């Protein structure tokens, strides 16, 4: 039986930094630090008085000699290490949102890696689920009723409805909340429950990713509230154009993984 970690949470930021080819930057932990030699997303502890973004800027300048111009919240994770109980805040940095030449200022190694095809090891334990999340495209097209598609650095990524003929060969499967709640067993690499409100959100916290079907203003605002708290897995919002046109920028600035326009969803 696992015991609750009662140590104070240490606030830590890490950057998901991309290059022009859509690859992610990983660096090794330098000698003298816990887990020396393990690979991670660069970052470090948030100091008193710093925002997450300010801490990320400082850490990347100190460790790698590059300047972060813009970063967007993505996922948050809590992880218990032997040396610390950490609250990780991952910030997303696109290729045009940083400048400079990468330097190894702490004697660490660094490497550009493709989502789904990471070639460096060992990885820091807190990052295992994160690597799976990175393979999910941030741009998806389609309909919840017929399936979603996108591209990652490894190629085509298809998400099939549970009852479709393609669900056994898809990258992920969509599952109605009622079926998820009943514990329906699905043979698939990944299962994404479809939810419609904040109450259901609380019941899907062990999912690989979650699709939130937004059909009204109340649900749209609930998404904003949940994103403000931080999400631990990729959240994909599906909504009709009337909702997307109003909320897309706000959702994206707060850390939604993808916004899908689905006009089969009737606004109510």
Report the location of each language-model feature.
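Conserved N-terminal beta-strand and adjoining loop/helix that marks the start
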Residues: 2-24, 45
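Conserved hydrophobic/aromatic beta-strand scaffold that supports enzyme active sites
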Residues: 16, 26, 88-92, 112
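Conserved Nudix-box catalytic region and its N-terminal flanking loop in Nudix hydrolases
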Residues: 23-62
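A short coil-to-beta-strand element that immediately follows conserved catalytic motifs
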Residues: 67-76
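Active-site-adjacent beta-strand/loop module that shapes the phosphate/pyrophosphate-binding cleft
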Residues: 77-101, 116, 127
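Nudix hydrolase/Nudix homology domain
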Residues: 103-160, 236, 253-261, 265-268
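Short loop-to-alpha-helix "cap/lid" segments that border enzyme active sites
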Residues: 149-153, 163-268
